[in-house]
Every structure is written in C-alpha cells, then in structure tokens.
UniProtKB/Swiss-Prot annotation:
It comes from Otolemur garnettii (Small-eared galago). This is Apolipoprotein C-I. GO terms for cellular component: endoplasmic reticulum; high-density lipoprotein particle; very-low-density lipoprotein particle. Pfam families: ApoC-I. PANTHER family: APOLIPOPROTEIN C-I. One of its GO terms (biological process) is negative regulation of receptor-mediated endocytosis. One of its GO terms (molecular function) is fatty acid binding. Belongs to the apolipoprotein C1 family.
Length: 80
C-alpha cells in the first residue's frame, strides 16, 4: 500500500524537478547580485574589524587568567 502511494508522489516530484524553475525565478537581477556582493563585503570588513579589536584588547588575557585562577581554586577546594 505504501509503495502504491509513494510511486505517484515520486513521479510528481521528479516531473517538477525536471521542469525547471519558473521563468520569473530563472533569471536573477544583476542589481540584486551587486547589492548582495556589497553586503557580503561590508559584513566581512566589519567582522575583520571586530576580530582585530578583540585581538588588540586585553580581554582574552584577562579571561584566560580568570579561568586559571578559578580552576586553581577549585583544585585546592577538592584537595582538602
């Protein structure tokens, strides 16, 4: 029974895939692609700026020291 129901669905899906995209969806507006590329470049630049700021700040060192100190405190408490 399942096979009898799944075969027509499979044929329908295959026909839809082989038909291809609708004409309105087939062509992409070049202006849209240009805007999308500009957006990607802008986001990439902003991400690089944030990463550079994080690298130049002392937050990673402070975080590492805090974790080390906390880990040492936990080790000492568990030792007792």
């Amino acid at each position: 029974m399942r096979l009898m129901l799944s075969l027509p669905v499979l044929v329908l899906v295959l026909a839809m895939v082989l038909e291809g995209p609708a004409p309105a969806q087939g062509t992409m507006d070049l202006d849209f692609t240009r805007h999308l590329k500009e957006f990607g470049n802008t986001m990439g630049d902003k991400a690089r700026e944030v990463i550079d700021r994080i690298k130049q700040s002392d937050i990673p060192a402070k975080t590492r020291n805090w974790f080390s100190e906390t880990f040492q405190k936990v080790k000492e408490k568990l030792k007792i």
